[in-house]
């Protein structure tokens, strides 16, 4: 199927998808969005988990999980898109990189950046990929603020004590 020059991808931090009710509601929501691909972060699956997000008309699923029940990323592709996956690179739950083709070569990277050290993690990831960036889509949860002055995590609360 020709997709022209556009590909629609949704990305969502699900904050865990082990509960069956949550998986079913998530599956219904994704089906209604009518997209070509879906990238999920914080799936919290373990490597040998039997839980899966089951979606009709979604043919390929690629997961990256850590040993613990935290982090985790997933890429789902719809039957509406003819993607040929050549290689998959993943780490322990923080990113998946798919090299493939949809009319031409493309790289899709779904990232869940750790809470601590996010800017350094992102910088290192981009440095490692230097020279391999053409036709690359990087998406996910970067756990960082776009503008430093909007980041409330570093503010300290000063309490005044009355004598």
Question: Which residue ranges define each predicted feature?
Answer:
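A shared catalytic/ligand-binding motif for oxyanion handling
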Residues: 1-163
């Amino acid at each position: 199927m020709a997709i022209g020059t556009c590909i629609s991808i949704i990305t969502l931090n699900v904050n865990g998808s082990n509960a069956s009710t949550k998986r079913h509601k998530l599956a219904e929501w994704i089906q209604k969005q009518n997209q070509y691909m879906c990238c999920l972060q914080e799936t919290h699956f373990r490597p040998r988990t039997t839980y899966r997000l089951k979606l009709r008309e979604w043919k390929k699923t690629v997961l990256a999980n850590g040993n613990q029940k935290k982090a985790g990323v997933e890429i789902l592709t719809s039957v509406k898109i003819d993607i040929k996956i050549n290689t998959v690179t993943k780490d322990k739950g923080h990113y998946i990189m798919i090299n493939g083709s949809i009319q031409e070569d493309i790289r899709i990277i779904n990232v869940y950046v750790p809470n601590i050290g996010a800017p350094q993690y992102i910088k290192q990831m981009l440095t490692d990929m230097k020279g391999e960036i053409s036709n690359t889509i990087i998406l996910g949860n970067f756990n960082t603020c776009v503008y430093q002055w909007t980041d409330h995590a570093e503010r300290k609360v000063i309490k005044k004590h009355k004598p």
